[in-house]
């Protein structure tokens, strides 16, 4: 298929683009590089630099596109609380612009990068797709709003669509991994201590109702996540909007992640306990049974050591090319 991938220079988007290319698809990427990395763009992909709102109409007007994978979005939870106006514009307005351009040019196949943040603070785990959606921040709220929009476009206009709600994406695929200027994810933050770009890491709360007192999360390997996008694109049905949770189904605590990073890197990695962060749930674990049954998707890299080893191979190879190193310099 001839595909458009928005945000294809980002962490998840670039790996998904690479995997789509490996499966024989023709990939065009739109990215404005507000957070993406040029080095992450697959060599065989066509790149168009620009904002989706500004260029998507012209790109799709070329004709021949058979599907879209939409990653382009703001995705920092804390920032979304401080700047909700920017999130509502950059996430929701952009998605609506894309949906209307797709409709205008007869592109009827969509996979949308949604998030577990749509669920907010769940009362029970594992989280299934039929649980209440109660986002606690603008990031989750904007993604949920886009999910609603996609549902209505599917019903009214016959759009074939899938929303994939990611849990904690981690790991690396070859020379593509997490290398953001503003890092918020646990594993890359901890590994930056091992590379000397940070003095220590923080554990936000050690009094959670979990086995070791630290928060528990479900980590999904980036390659497993990318493969789910391929399966979704190749099985979408007109007039239907499917929603799937994507996680490993296993939970690891912050302490377990820090200790695994110590084992893999051979670095002591000082970890300091800090106060809990408002809005953080004690435990977030996905049920991906629906994706396994309906998509035929099964995560293959669920072991925490494998995820950390892949992330460390990428992080340690970055050296002074990392955002952390550039900022320090």
From Swiss-Prot:
EC number: 5.1.3.2
Pfam families hit by this protein: Epimerase
Classification of source organism: Bacteria, Bacillati, Actinomycetota, Actinomycetes, Mycobacteriales
Subunit record text: Homodimer.
Function: Involved in the metabolism of galactose. Catalyzes the conversion of UDP-galactose (UDP-Gal) to UDP-glucose (UDP-Glc) through a mechanism involving the transient reduction of NAD.
Active site: residue positions: 139 (proton acceptor)
One GO BP annotation of this record: galactose catabolic process via UDP-galactose, Leloir pathway
Origin species: Corynebacterium glutamicum (strain ATCC 13032 / DSM 20300 / JCM 1318 / BCRC 11384 / CCUG 27702 / LMG 3730 / NBRC 12168 / NCIMB 10025 / NRRL B-2784 / 534)
InterPro entries (UniProt xref): Epimerase_deHydtase, NAD(P)-bd_dom_sf, UDP_G4E
Descriptive protein name: UDP-glucose 4-epimerase
Binding site residues for substrate: 115, 139, 168, 185-186, 202-204, 217, 277-280
Catalytically driven reaction(s): UDP-alpha-D-glucose = UDP-alpha-D-galactose
Alphabetical UniProt keywords: Carbohydrate metabolism, Galactose metabolism, Isomerase, NAD
Pathway where this protein functions: Carbohydrate metabolism; galactose metabolism
Binding residues for NAD(+): 11-12, 31-36, 51-52, 71-75, 115, 139, 143, 167
Record gene name: galE
């Amino acid at each position: 298929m001839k595909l458009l991938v928005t945000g294809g220079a980002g962490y998840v988007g670039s790996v998904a683009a690479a995997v789509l290319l490996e499966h024989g698809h023709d990939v065009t990427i739109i990215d404005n590089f507000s957070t993406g990395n040029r080095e992450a763009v697959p060599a065989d992909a066509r790149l168009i630099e620009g904002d989706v709102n500004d260029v998507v109409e012209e790109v799709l007007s070329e004709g021949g596109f058979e599907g879209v994978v939409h990653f382009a979005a703001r995705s920092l939870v804390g920032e979304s609380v401080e700047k909700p106006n920017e999130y509502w514009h950059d996430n929701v307005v952009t998605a609506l612009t894309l949906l209307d351009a797709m409709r205008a040019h007869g592109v009827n196949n969509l996979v949308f990068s949604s998030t577990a943040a749509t669920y907010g603070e769940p009362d029970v785990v594992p989280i299934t797709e039929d649980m209440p959606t109660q986002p606690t921040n603008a990031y989750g709220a904007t993604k949920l709003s886009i999910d609603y929009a996609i549902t209505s476009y599917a019903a009214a206009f016959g759009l074939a669509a899938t929303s994939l709600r990611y849990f904690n994406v981690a790991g690396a695929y070859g020379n593509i991994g997490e290398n953001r200027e503003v890092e918020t994810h646990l594993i890359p933050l901890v590994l930056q201590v091992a590379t000397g770009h940070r003095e220590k890491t923080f554990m936000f709360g050690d009094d959670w109702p979990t086995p070791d007192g630290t928060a528990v999360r479900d980590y999904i390997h980036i390659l497993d996540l990318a493969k789910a996008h391929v399966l979704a694109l190749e099985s979408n049905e007109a007039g239907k909007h499917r929603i799937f949770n994507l996680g490993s189904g296993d939970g690891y605590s912050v302490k377990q992640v820090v200790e695994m990073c110590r084992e893999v890197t051979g670095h002591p990695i000082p970890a300091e306990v800090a106060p809990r962060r408002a809005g953080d749930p004690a435990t977030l674990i996905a049920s991906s049974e629906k994706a396994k049954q309906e998509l035929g998707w099964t995560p293959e890299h669920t072991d925490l050591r494998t995820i950390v080893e892949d992330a460390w191979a990428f992080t340690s190879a970055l050296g002074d090319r990392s955002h952390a190193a550039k900022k320090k310099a």
